[in-house]
Regions:
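Fungal N-terminal intrinsically disordered, low-complexity regulatory regions
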Residues: 476-478
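Membrane-interfacial, low-structure loops and terminal tails that flank and connect transmembrane helices
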Residues: 175-202, 640-702
Length: 795
């Protein structure tokens, strides 16, 4: 605080430096200047506590392991990095010891692990210098004291939860009901769903919006030209070999964001920007995210328009810009708009990132950039580290030799590749350029097919599987199959009709449509697994869609197991709601949930990715599903339902019930009510299914069952994350924001467990806390991932 009692926020610095010259790039040395009054000032630096190292460490070398194509200056091409360390033991320096990601080094009781490295960084501000990276490495240091005891305690608690939820209630229940007869089996009342309806729903969702075939001449050029052969063309980019369709989708997302320009496919727009750039100079193609950036840009465009007519036209155009976020490069290059962008660039919190994205879009749309990125010609050797070649490196070979010599054009061919094959590629590209300029769809389609065949022929031995490339293009062309949310919505409607109005046929149809949606979502997950060559859980799009698929898997298993119980249909309903919301988010929020396939960060190349991450996101799906049934219970109580609840231990009842439908709980009376609690059994009579109090018991039982499963999975996932963190970073817990809020979610459900034992209105409090727990979980996934910076976040 200053002399007048004011306050000043201090910026947090993760690394401590004594002077500006020692500061790491991307971690500037910026102490806060505080006015103490009387002309006195002081510099205050808020940072970590600095302690002396236990031993001297020297960085002997820094090694990079890369993906396909080697290191290109892009962080995405890095697969792993290794520091070669030497330690001073007093008697001299040791031999170099490798310290890699997920492979820490122990020395004298201390663990050293890779925390950061110096990635490439572009100059974004005036006076800043661009860096190719590789200037330093950052090592973490930990002592791991008591780690094994902590982890043993965590594992023991997981085992204890499983015993408390599953084993103990079963033992108590069987003792109480040893003398009771098994309940009668429910008559199989499901009616076979209409095959025609199911097929129609599936076809309606998966069908692309393909117009009816008409005379080719009547179609616009972007619809008439056949770009399907390019779907089997590989492009080397960011350390991967992508299909051209996937590649174009990624590149165009940098320009137009989630929007499609004039209804064109990303493949067509990429080629059209490359071959006809003049057509887009004043076209609205650059996407600007958020009202905070759009409003000042729109005001600058309107203010720069001279004359009443021009101003009115600008106002109308900017009204559309504020709605859809697309603006033309010509408008962005107006001096008044550029001045506004420079001002916005200074606002590091609200608009600097958006300005950086606009600058990136303006660069990506340039024909020179687009041509240089078309690395479609495989190298002459089988070495995966070799860079592929762009069409720009061979296209001049299509020019007549005499004319090229007269014009001074260099026709130097690529070394090691048959000149005839290179000329075939160049000739096909020239034919495509000429046909595109003439807007001749038939000739362009023929040239596209020739180009695809010619690049395949250059080196078939290193070319990826064309079937996989084709399916990858198909996957992106069909919106990543996120339209399956429509099928889940249809399932929800039918299931609600069947469950609320006790309409057996609607319930059967709803379960059938849920089965179709589940199969379609399974196909989407498996297809992405195949085309990406890794399990899809390493970015937000994959985490959200795969988590909902896990929830649907669980629901499908429970529905099969309990198909003759009154609870039939409720798990399918909650899973349908979960998957519908997840796929809707993926479909309508492609900026936040980027569907493009990229390489994983180096730290994710570990078996724990497939254990810890899958368990955590599975628990999140079950938490959301529990919130759906809890919301149903709250609605039931709001509509005047009695304060009924399922007797404790809902999941144990599933273990006891089996799949035959024989009642393990309560005989003809439905759910067992006992003074001492015990496992809740889903009874077989109509009263349990929908009579007075029965609906509340079912909803509470479903919530309790899903909550118990998610409770154990969440805690197990947190423990597994601690094991992975200790394995990778030398410490099991670092108070990272996402770690903290995952723990907060667990605490809410731990509170739920204990509150349920003490309160009288168990069903109400269970539902309220289940909804609160889901809110904390969603806060963890949304705010922590996209707003707050941390090891697990995308901020």
């Amino acid at each position: 605080s200053g002399p007048q009692g004011g306050s000043t926020w201090l910026d947090y610095h993760p690394y401590v430096f004594d002077r500006r010259a020692d500061a790491l790039r991307r971690h500037p040395f910026e102490p806060t200047l505080v006015d103490l009054g009387g002309g006195r000032k002081a510099e205050v630096l808020f940072s970590r506590v600095r302690v002396p190292m236990p031993t001297s460490v020297a960085l002997d070398d820094f090694l990079l392991a890369t993906h396909i194509g080697g290191y290109t200056g892009e962080a995405s091409t890095i697969r792993d990095y290794t520091s070669m360390l030497r330690f001073d033991d007093g008697a001299g320096w040791s031999e170099p010891v490798p310290c890699s990601v997920n492979a820490p080094v122990e020395h004298d009781g201390w663990w050293f692990f890779q925390a950061q490295w110096d990635p490439p960084d572009q100059a974004r501000f005036e006076g800043d210098r661009a860096s190719r990276g590789l200037n330093y490495t950052v090592l973490g240091v930990a002592n791991r004291e008591g780690v094994m005891i902590q982890l043993f305690g965590c594992i023991l608690s997981v085992v204890g939860m499983a015993y408390a939820f599953y084993v103990k209630p079963i033992i108590k229940r069987r003792k109480r009901e040893a003398a009771q007869a098994l309940a009668a089996q429910v008559r199989a009342g499901g009616q076979r769903a209409s095959t025609a309806l199911m097929v129609a729903v599936a076809c309606a969702v998966l069908a692309c919006a393909v117009p009816a075939r008409a005379d080719e001449a009547a179609k616009p050029f972007h619809e008439a030209v056949d770009l399907l052969p390019l779907g089997e063309v590989a492009v080397q980019t960011e350390g991967r070999l992508k299909s051209f369709g996937s590649f174009a989708n990624t590149q165009m997302s940098f320009v137009s964001g989630p929007r499609r320009i004039n209804g064109q496919s990303p493949e067509f727009t990429y080629l059209d920007l490359l071959l006809r750039p003049e057509a887009y100079e004043d076209a609205d193609i650059v996407f600007v995210k958020g009202a905070a950036a759009r409003v000042p840009i729109a005001e600058a465009v309107i203010d720069s328009s001279k004359g009443d007519d021009a101003r009115k036209a600008a106002e109308e155009r900017m009204a559309g810009f504020l709605k859809h976020g697309l603006i033309s490069p010509a408008l962005l290059q107006r001096p008044e708009v550029m001045a506004t962008l420079r001002q916005m660039e200074q606002d590091l919190i609200r608009t600097e990132k958006v300005v950086s994205q606009i600058q990136g879009a303006m660069s990506v749309r340039e024909p020179k950039y687009l041509l240089s990125r078309l690395l479609v010609i495989p190298p002459a050797t089988d070495d995966p580290q070799q860079r592929w070649h762009s069409l720009g490196e061979v296209m001049m070979l299509a020019v007549d030799a005499e004319r090229a010599k007269a014009a001074g054009i260099d026709q130097k061919p690529l070394p090691g590749i048959d000149i005839a094959l290179q000329r075939a590629v160049a000739s096909a590209w020239k034919d495509l350029v000429d046909a595109w300029a003439a807007q001749d769809a038939a000739a362009a389609s023929k040239a596209v097919a020739a180009l695809a065949a010619s690049v395949h022929a250059v080196n078939p031995a290193v070319y990826p599987d064309t079937a996989r490339l084709g399916w990858e293009s198909w996957y992106f062309r069909n919106g990543n199959l996120t339209r399956v949310w429509l099928v889940y919505m249809a399932a929800i409607i039918l299931l609600l009709l069947g469950l609320v109005y006790r309409w057996p046929r609607a319930l059967a149809w709803g379960l059938a449509v849920f089965g179709i949606a589940f199969l379609l979502q399974t196909a989407a997950v498996m297809l992405r697994w195949w085309i990406s060559q890794r399990w899809p859980n390493s970015n937000m799009f994959e985490a959200v869609t795969t988590a909902s698929w896990f929830g649907a898997c669980c629901a499908a298993g429970l529905e099969l197991w309990l198909r003759r119980r009154p609870v039939r249909g409720w798990f399918a309903l909650t899973a349908s709601a979960c998957s519908m919301v997840a796929l809707m988010a993926a479909h309508f929020l492609p900026v936040q949930l980027n569907p493009n396939i990229s390489n994983m960060m180096p730290v994710l190349h570990d078996v724990w990715l497939y254990i810890h991450t899958n368990v955590i996101i599975f628990s999140y799906a079950l938490i959301f599903m529990a919130a759906i049934s809890a919301g149903g219970y709250l609605l039931y109580r709001w509509r005047g339902g009695p304060a009924t609840y399922a007797r404790a231990g809902g999941t144990a009842a599933i273990v006891m019930a089996g799949g035959t439908g024989s009642a393990a709980a309560g005989g003809a009376g439905g759910a067992v009510v006992s003074a001492g609690g015990g496992a809740m059994g889903f009874g077989d009579d109509a009263q349990s299914a929908g009579g007075k109090g029965g609906l509340g018991e079912l909803l509470d039982g479903v919530t309790l069952l899903l909550m118990e499963l998610s409770f154990i999975l969440l805690w197990a996932g947190i423990v597994m994350g601690a094991i992975w963190a200790d394995h990778s970073w030398g410490r099991p817990w670092g108070w990272d924001p996402k770690e903290v809020f995952a723990l907060n979610t667990f605490i809410v459900f731990a509170l739920l467990i204990h509150v349920r034992w003490r309160v009288k209105d168990k069903g109400l409090w269970t539902a309220v806390l289940a909804v609160i727990g889901a809110a904390v979980m969603l806060f963890n996934w949304i705010v922590i991932n996209f707003v707050i910076t941390g090891l697990h976040s995308y901020a």
